[in-house]
Amino acid sequence: MTQDIGDWAPYLSPEKNKDYFNSLLSFLNSRVGFEIYPPRGTWFRAFEYSSFSSTRVVILGQDPYHGEGQAEGLSFSVPRGMSIPPSLRNIYKELDQDDVDFTNPGHGHLENWAKQGVLLLNSVLTVEKNSPASHANQGWEVFTDQVITLLNDNKDNLVFLLWGAYANKKSVLIDSNKHLILSAAHPSPFSAHKGFFGCKHFSKTNSYLKASNQELIDWSLPL
């Protein structure tokens, strides 16, 4: 964990000394000859862009995009210049239908959300090229579950956006008396019509933030 993670460090640095994390690092080192996404220096970008103190919203993904050049260390986000992935296109469609200020920016780079305190967290932080879930069950899930637990225990009035069955399982880590849990189907083309479209999670997030005297999220993205 050499990447700068700012004020997350006191909370997350102890993880480095745990057996599961050492096993994870050994696994990653054993895969050094394979193409791993995102690039090593961006594995912890979600924490770099969204400080612990600023985090107000968590959008949980599963694992990074496995296509070349797509993953950049933020769930659902891709660098400018990359084609917008289908799930993110559907997120944009929902934003466009929701009661928030949003215009499709023509790119999939979500840094603007992250820097407002939207933690764009994948449950697994690495993947191998063209091999989805190739780094599942190696220890990342233990680490990111601990992230959710730390947020749950040390903060109040967070919003957790859990899309799809995988993300919804994480609700057991969250105290719904302290935080708002918004669950829906996954925005992928296979399931978006089963409850993601029309969920209005973005306006519901801001309504909750307003009610708890927090700054609203500007969901619009720079063109």
Regions found by a protein language model. Give the residues of each.
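Short, extreme N-terminal leader segments that mark the start of a protein/domain
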Residues: 1-10
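A polyanion-binding, active-site-adjacent surface
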Residues: 7, 14-162, 166-169, 174-175, ...
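C-terminal substrate-binding/active-site "lid" region of AdoMet-derived donor-dependent transferases
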Residues: 196, 201
